[in-house]
A protein has these predicted regions:
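Mobile beta-alpha loop/short-helix "lid" or hinge segments that flank ligand
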Residues: 10-21, 67, 100-120
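N-terminal beta1-alpha1-beta2 submodule of the flavodoxin-like/Rossmannoid cofactor-binding fold
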Residues: 1-65, 123-156
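A glycine- and small-aliphatic-rich helix-loop capping segment at beta-alpha/alpha-beta transitions
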Residues: 60-68, 94-99
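Short, proline-enriched alpha-helix->beta-strand connector loops that line the catalytic pocket
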Residues: 40, 70-73
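Short, glycine-/small-residue-rich phosphate/pyrophosphate-handling segment
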Residues: 73-113, 127-131
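Short, structurally constrained coil/turn elements
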Residues: 3-5, 70, 105
Length: 156
């Protein structure tokens, strides 16, 4: 996606960021995460599935920002070592995204048996995912551009 004209990407690993210290998320306000969310037109969340859900750290970090998310596109990628490819984590995140003011795209990407889908350098080895990833990224960019136009030009 970063090869698209006018598109900049940034990878944020929430496991390496300061944790919110209370329900208001004061430790993360004005942090790299908050600033990146404010600047972003779109967000891709890659979430592993744990016991049919997502990890508490993801929920805690997501809840630490609110105004930064309003009317921004989000795409969700589910990851699982099992056969379901994170389908259940995606289903669990959808209502959370809506509550946060994010606009989900209709394409998801699900990586089942993730341990065999990538090599040691993180490169995709299972080419059957390429078409779905392409559709996912095209939809995400379309939604991001459409919502950006709306945020900048349409008063609510």
């Amino acid at each position: 996606v970063s090869k698209q004209p006018g598109v900049e990407t940034e990878l944020l690993d929430i496991a390496t960021m300061p944790l919110p210290t209370n329900d208001a998320g004061e430790a993360i306000k004005e942090s790299a995460f908050s600033v990146a969310m404010d600047r972003a037109d779109a967000i891709v969340i890659v979430a592993p599935e744990y016991n049919h859900g997502y990890c508490g750290l993801l929920k805690h970090v997501l809840d630490s920002c609110l105004k930064e998310y309003i009317h921004k596109a989000v795409g969700i990628v589910g990851v699982s070592a099992g056969p379901f490819g994170g389908t259940r984590v995606i289903q669990n995140l959808l209502p959370v995204m809506r509550e946060l003011g994010l606009v989900t795209i209709f394409w998801d990407v699900n990586f089942s048996s993730v341990q065999t889908s990538f090599d040691a350098q993180g490169q995709l080895t299972d080419q059957s995912y390429v078409r779905r990833i392409d559709k996912f990224l095209k939809e995400l960019l379309w939604m991001a551009r459409t919502l950006r136009y709306g945020r900048e030009n349409v008063a609510i």
